[in-house]
Amino acid sequence: MSGPRPVVLSGPSGAGKSTLLKRLLQEHSGIFGFSVSHTTRNPRPGEENGKDYYFVTREVMQRDIAAGDFIEHAEFSGNLYGTSKVAVQAVQAMNRICVLDVDLQGVRNIKATDLRPIYISVQPPSLHVLEQRLRQRNTETEESLVKRLAAAQADMESSKEPGLFDVVIINDSLDQAYAELKEALSEEIKKAQRTGA
């Protein structure tokens, strides 16, 4: 795939990835583009098909995975999630820096491709803070909350693995985390601005 170097943003649910990503895309709308992932889960209130996710059936997604149409895919809480090659190519075709929001399994899958992105992990300051954030969302059942927290603990440990991420941001303060994210991407932003992304 050609075009500007992509960015892989990862971290546990509730760490603030989506909030940071929305802010980045708003401030740099002509520079970054969001790779819209596919999922077999049901939409949450306010989510739009084709904007937040492509909501598809398990059968359709399994067929496309088998056909090699996905850069990465993973299963969480009985639902499939994945990034299609077409979604990344669509952003790159606009000469924008493609941002992929993926889980840890997705990061490992992408490492095995020729994509060569910048890997950034967004982590909560603690598991306790993360639990508070997830409870405030009020979108999880107790069972799914327990699963998310277990996955988050593994994610937080893996973020310390040498060489897995280029940058790890601890999101204790949204403004500070956003400043760190922009700093981590400053060279790519400058390159994209010079080439008229």
Swiss-Prot record:
The gene is GUK1. It comes from Homo sapiens. Changing residue 91 to M: Increases in kcat with GMP as substrate. Its EC number is 2.7.4.8. It comes from the Eukaryota. Residues 4-186 form the Guanylate kinase-like domain. GO terms for biological process: dATP metabolic process; dGDP biosynthetic process; dGMP metabolic process; GDP biosynthetic process; GDP-mannose metabolic process; glycoprotein transport; nucleobase-containing small molecule interconversion; purine nucleotide metabolic process. The modification N-acetylserine is found at residue 2. This is Guanylate kinase.
